[in-house]
Swiss-Prot record:
Keyword Aminoacyl-tRNA synthetase appears in the UniProt entry: yes
MF annotations from Gene Ontology: aminoacyl-tRNA deacylase activity; ATP binding; isoleucine-tRNA ligase activity
Major enzyme class: ligase
Protein's recorded name: Isoleucine--tRNA ligase
Record organism: Antonospora locustae (Microsporidian parasite)
UniProt motif ('KMSKS' region) ranges: 505-509
Length: 628
């Protein structure tokens, strides 16, 4: 049972009307976590009822819960092992950030929920401070995030592009040559320059914030490879506190060092703070139109862009990218070992391992594992003046602090102080990302190494949805490879997503799917199981659920099979007769059927079973019984 993390907190925040971290601190972490604890077991009985009725085997009696002390202690032990291997570090990175949940997300979380949306598309004029080529010019930059303009720090161009100086009415501007007529049909091109000629030119910022950065080399033109001539203007407004590419671009000329903080004038809820007083308290998305209005004549074009954009997988709200401090597991340096381990896994279908998972591993980044939240396993790091003590067990914390420790949620360990060499060490505030907990599950479910020293590594078999190639499969694979240099599992069946009959995601709000229990009670659990196991979903392909399809299984396979059983019950002495050639034929057919099933099952290939069974029952019912 996964019981921690943002999903639980988000439900509590909605129920209690909590709008930010301040509300939680005012309420008290102890009381807040008590509320979280109340709801995590809410649907346990309903879940057990459906699973048991489906005939799916799950060991409910010995199930693990991520909120249990034993599970959390194993996570501490695993983290300490990673920490002592030098596989953990703290850094400042531009991360996907959920303003609704007030926490950064990992890159694979951000990739889970993309939507087609429209955003503002504007062209902004940035006047150069000195004449260029004899003209008083303005650079024309394109952006779809007007809210980042108050924290503008530089202009980026591509030094290999050709740029055009053009006149628009009585003013002069410069942008990539081939993009001028896309936006300005009446523009008059005067001359052309190479991109490298624009480098280091000073320009005015759109808002007069952070002007003291000018003496450090900001508010100038720099090169970036990612600047495109396919869309936009070939001129990019750079806000390194809110863009990963922007941040990297500022490290190239040495303006900033890696992990250095830069202007990021937002609070944890995505609202402007006192650094930008004109928009203080406004959420970034709400501020777009106000910023466009205040820029006035600096806006040369205003329209809409339709594109795919990441949303928070839990709150379903747009993510932003924000420079935040975070704790990371070093994954990038482990890519060769991750790929080697992956090559030993039998993936079903094979293409998932050879392409989807392999490609994801090849581009893996260091893994953000800390969250600025409350209901989760606390990261066991105590710090003092840049020095850290990493704790790997409850006994170790009790021994070093002199306090008896029972539960290790935040409300019980945040005030624990470790005194060493006359200095007081206090715990950092972050908790683990719940995906880190999921990756630790194979060890923590057994309370390894405290009550169990057998890791059962690698596991024989694992199964989950195709989305877990960037989730659970990935986190288990990373932790096992980095920690123990072995793959976590031998065989992996990857299923697709079951969609509603209208091809949309199943939604309680839309009521676009039948109650599973109603389907089972109407057609039988076997009908539903056989329908699913014979569908494309067991080969990692999506499928649209059809209640009629379940009924068809009942009609074509199970009812004929039940009729066969009924027939034999009416002929109790049939086996006493001498064996005929028809008997030999049906026994041979049965043997062939069994061999096909064994062959496919040994390879974890499930999809053919329904076809084999239907064919055999047809032979049994329509030929053997009728003609014998």
């Amino acid at each position: 049972w996964d019981r921690h993390g943002v999903p639980v907190e988000y439900e509590i925040d909605k129920a209690l009307g909590i709008t930010g971290v301040k509300d939680i601190h005012d309420m008290g972490i102890r009381k807040y976590n008590k509320e979280c604890r109340k709801i995590v077991l809410r649907y346990t009985k309903e879940w057990e009822a459906v699973v048991k009725r489906m005939g799916r085997w799950i060991d409910f009696r010995n199930g693990y819960r991520t909120m249990d002390r034993s599970f959390m202690e194993s996570i501490w032990h695993i983290f300490k092992m990673l920490y002592e291997k030098g596989s953990v570090y703290r850094g400042h990175r531009v991360m996907p950030y959920s303003t609704a949940c007030s926490t950064p997300l990992s890159n694979f979380e951000a990739n889970q929920n993309y939507k087609d949306v429209s955003d503002p598309s504007i062209l902004v004029a940035f006047p150069l401070r000195k004449p260029f080529k004899g003209y008083s010019l303005s650079l024309v930059a394109w952006t779809t995030t007007p809210w980042t303009l108050p924290s503008h720090m530089a202009i980026l161009v591509n030094q290999s592009f050709i740029y055009a100086i053009f006149r628009l009415k009585s003013a002069f501007f410069i942008m990539q040559r081939d993009r001028v007529n896309v936006y300005f049909k009446d523009a008059v091109v005067i001359s052309e320059v190479k991109g490298h000629e624009l480098l280091h030119l000073e320009h005015d910022q759109p808002f007069m914030y952070y002007n003291h950065y000018r003496e450090k080399g900001f508010f100038r033109v720099y090169h970036a490879d990612f600047v495109s001539e396919i869309d936009g203007t070939g001129v990019v407004h750079c806000s390194p506190g809110f863009g990963e590419d922007d941040y990297k671009a500022m490290t190239m000329p040495g303006l900033i060092k890696e992990n250095e903080l830069l202007p990021s004038p937002l609070d944890e809820n995505g609202r402007f703070n006192e650094e930008v007083p004109e928009y203080k308290g406004m959420h970034v998305k709400d501020a777009d139109q106000s910023i466009i209005k205040d820029l006035g004549k600096k806006i040369l074009y205003e329209g809409k862009v339709y594109h795919r954009y990441p949303f928070c997988w839990r709150s379903d709200t747009p993510l932003i990218y924000k420079l935040v401090p975070n704790w990371f597991v070093r994954v990038k340096r482990e890519i060769p070992r991750l790929l080697e381990s992956n090559s030993t896994i039998n993936w079903i279908p094979e293409s998932i391992g050879e392409h989807k998972f392999k490609n994801w591993l090849s581009e893996a980044r260091d893994w953000s594992i800390s969250r600025n939240r409350f209901w989760g396993t606390p990261i066991p790091l105590w710090h003092c003046d840049g020095k850290y003590i990493c704790i790997g067990s409850i006994e170790e914390l009790s021994r070093l602090s002199g306090r008896k420790i029972d539960d290790i949620h935040r409300e019980n360990v945040d005030d624990v102080v470790i005194c060493k060499d006359g200095e007081k060490y206090r715990r950092i505030e972050e908790v683990f990302d719940c995906w880190f907990e999921s990756g630790c599950m194979p060890y923590a479910q057994r309370h390894w190494p405290f009550e169990c020293d057998n890791l059962c590594l690698p596991a024989d078999f694992v199964a989950e949805g195709v989305d877990q190639t960037r989730g659970w499969f990935y986190t288990m694979h990373v932790i096992s490879t980095v920690l123990l240099a072995k793959p976590r599992f031998r065989n992996c069946i990857v299923n697709g997503i079951v969609l509603a009959s209208d091809k949309k995601k199943m939604s309680k709000r839309l009521k676009n799917y039948p109650d599973p229990m109603d389907v089972i009670n109407r057609y039988s659990a076997d009908s539903l199981r056989l329908y699913l196991i014979s569908s494309p979903v067991v080969m990692a392909e999506n499928m649209c659920f059809s209640e009629e399809g379940v009924g068809e299984v009942l009609k074509t396979l199970l009812i004929p099979w039940y009729n066969c059983i009924y027939f034999y019950s009416e002929c109790p002495n049939a086996g006493d007769q001498e064996q005929t050639r028809m008997d030999d034929w049906i026994l041979n057919t049965l043997n062939t059927f069994g061999n096909k099933v064994k062959r496919d099952m040994s390879k974890y290939m499930l999809q053919g079973v329904m076809g084999y069974a239907t064919s055999f029952v047809n032979d049994l019912s329509n030929w053997y019984i009728r003609l014998n």
